[in-house]
Amino acid sequence: MQQEEIIEGYYGASKGLKKSGIYAKLDFLQSATGLVLALFMIAHMFLVSSILISDEAMYKVAKFFEGSLFLKAGEPAIVSVVAAGVILILVVHAFLALRKFPINYRQYKVFKTHKHLMKHGDTSLWFIQALTGFAMFFLASIHLFVMLTEPESIGPHGSSYRFVTQNFWLLYIFLLFAVELHGSIGLYRLVIKWGWFKNVSIQGLRKVKWAMSVFFIVLGLCTYGAYIKKGLENKDNGIKTMQEAIEADGKFHKE
């Protein structure tokens, strides 16, 4: 009992905080929002990589998000609503995750000492997740704001124009690695935390986690290259404004 009190005093914990159930509820909410964002990330990567199939395939995916199954021409505002929802979930998740970040130098030193002494792989993964999560909050917010305010620009020509001519390639290369590492580590830690797939060993889960990271990073880099290539073709074809790029995408609808 005395040892427990010493540890609690070292970390600044109190008996009142220990008895509160609010922290368990916040922890569950953090896990739930993280799971939603991770699943969205996976779906998003598969959908944007449709440009690897063809420009028309990517255009159809974009129109699908605009409700083309129900509205013949699609409605870009639907994309704005989805983007707003993702932004809300991202902010809530980030706010909840900040509870576990070292908030002062003393806590950082405690974590650093713990990380050095334990030399545990999962502790290092948490540190990577914390860094990528911090970067994602800013990088993803910029991307989501563009999707929120310019949903009509999503398409093979419009998106690639943003990549090359508007220089978003610099943002997206950092966002790619941050999202894929953060998401795969997050899913791995969720599986362990909540006891899913109990018949799979920790070593097996780690292999799945790294396989997932490699797969999505490679897929992301191939997709990244495809948008760069298309963006350079836009320049060669004389597309000088976003409006011209949007009009070029419109030809797929007419077809």
Q: What is each PLM-predicted segment?
A:
Residues 1-255:
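Membrane-embedded alpha-helical bundles that constitute the cytochrome b-like, heme-associated redox core
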